[in-house]
UniProtKB/Swiss-Prot annotation:
It is found in: Mitochondrion outer membrane. HAMAP family: Mdm10 (MF_03102). This is Mitochondrial distribution and morphology protein 10. The keyword rRNA-binding does not apply. It comes from Paracoccidioides lutzii (strain ATCC MYA-826 / Pb01) (Paracoccidioides brasiliensis).
């Protein structure tokens, strides 16, 4: 489950009409959400609030083993009037990343002017709603106790196709009397719909980097030729994207290089009852280290998704195999009120196979719209989610996240073979030299937002 400030930051992207999916950094976002999720390792409490449409705060306290905390503040020039901020109203699917549906490339939408107050009473309009002010976000977090760390984030939408991001991190050792060390990361994003590019510079070893992503197919910036009706009747069914990244540090003489491909089905490909399930395939290569990784993610039903990853290194001949899944659950009362046909758990299967449903009256348009769109109703209907992943070494992580009354709970456990460094002479060792198997971590995280 992402933090409340991350949720507000995503709401800022949506309000400013910035497409965060058209980036090489998010090439494997679906597989990462299903396979690389983290579990809480201790007790953690988060108290958050969106006190005004422009200002949010978060207080965090962690315990078990050690006590620490953080204080976060966030300000945005775009009013987030339509963003649910109470923990009882926040859509759970907005907080828990899962299968991410890719949409056809489109022309970047001009960020809304601040004088667009449609539906907003004049009494709640603030002085920050200046038509000359560009969409901007300011975020600062102070981590306590020592070593004290201060992080800051500045995001500004410079134009409809360009966005600037500045991130700073400053830390100071507990007993050090010297000036705090600070690192600045500058990123410039450029998105045209057809392709996207990212330039970055970090003061840490003077690191320079570039990322790019190219979408094959028609260019959304160019007008379609021929009959517009025929163009609408033949929508894109899939999207193939290719990209890469390169890094170089003149100080440490470090070079980094990677490239990748992504093939994903689009919503138009799965609207037909006889079509396949939505899926995403990715292939990433790192030539310098000889690493190769492939992922396959499948949305088997509106509430069930699977993902797998296979990695291989041509130099060391080491391999990695990971599999995971997520299962969403919702209460029967909400299912019957919002989606009457969803009471039958096999309705979606009959719909995909084209078999008429005689037991329950199914509305195909209603079911398909729920299957593919991340609407507020489907988000509210989801009460909890279970995630499980396992690799070839039998490292298992299980995570449950859901809503309990006014609280958002995240509970997880990690199991796996213990490392030899943590084994004592009395620790049992399995035949063949295998180490013992047991608990690695258990934790609970609680979030309350008002």
């Amino acid at each position: 489950m992402c933090d409340f400030m991350d949720y507000i930051q995503l709401a800022f992207y949506d309000a400013s009409k910035w497409n965060r999916d058209n980036s090489y950094s998010r090439l494997t976002t679906t597989a990462n959400a299903l396979l690389d999720f983290s579990t809480p390792e201790r007790l953690k409490v988060n108290l958050s609030s969106l006190s005004t449409p422009h200002f949010a705060t978060t207080y965090t306290l962690g315990t078990v083993g050690l006590i620490d905390g953080s204080i976060s503040y966030l300000f945005t020039t775009i009013p987030l009037h339509n963003t649910p901020s109470r923990s009882s109203l926040i859509p759970l699917r907005k907080l828990v990343p899962g299968y991410r549906q890719i949409y056809p490339p489109s022309i970047p939408i001009e960020y809304p002017t601040a004088n667009d107050h449609s539906g907003i009473p004049a009494a709640v309009r603030s002085k920050a709603d200046n038509p000359k002010m560009k969409p901007t976000l300011l975020h600062a977090t102070l981590h306590l106790p020592p070593p004290t760390t201060l992080t800051g984030l500045f995001i500004c939408r410079l134009s409809s196709t360009t966005q600037l991001s500045l991130a700073v991190c400053s830390s100071r050792a507990p007993a050090s009397k010297s000036a705090p060390q600070a690192t600045l990361l500058t990123q410039i994003f450029h998105d045209t719909g057809k392709y996207s590019s990212e330039f970055l510079f970090s003061t840490d070893n003077a690191l320079l980097g570039f990322k790019g992503l190219w979408n094959f197919g028609p260019d959304p910036r160019k007008p379609t030729r021929g009959d517009p009706a025929s163009q609408r009747s033949r929508p894109l069914l899939s999207l193939l994207s290719a990209g890469g990244e390169v890094y170089y540090s003149p100080v440490s003489s470090v070079v980094g290089l990677s490239t990748g491909l992504r093939f994903a089905t689009l919503p138009a490909a799965t609207e037909n009852a006889h079509s396949a399930f939505p899926y995403t395939l990715t292939l990433t290569l790192t030539p310098l280290t000889g690493s190769m990784s492939t992922t396959y993610s499948l949305l088997a039903s509106p509430n069930l998704a699977f993902s797998s990853r296979f990695g291989f290194n041509v130099y060391s001949w080491e391999s990695e195999m990971v599999a995971g899944c997520e299962l969403w659950r919702r209460s029967k009362s909400k299912s019957q009120n919002i989606y009457p046909s969803a009471v039958d758990n096999l309705a979606w299967a009959r719909l995909k196979m084209g078999v008429p449903d005689t037991a329950v009256s199914v509305n195909p348009e209603h079911e398909l719209s729920y299957f593919h769109k991340e609407g507020h109703n489907s988000s509210h209907a989801s009460d909890s989610v279970i995630k499980v992943r396992v690799d070839q070494s039998w490292n298992i992580r299980a995570l449950w996240e859901g809503r309990v009354k006014e609280l958002l709970i995240s509970a997880g456990v990690a199991l796996g073979p213990a490392s030899r460094s943590t084994l004592s002479y009395a620790s049992p060792v399995a035949p063949g030299g295998l180490s013992s198997y047991g608990w690695k971590s258990v934790g609970v995280s609680v979030l309350y937002a008002s």
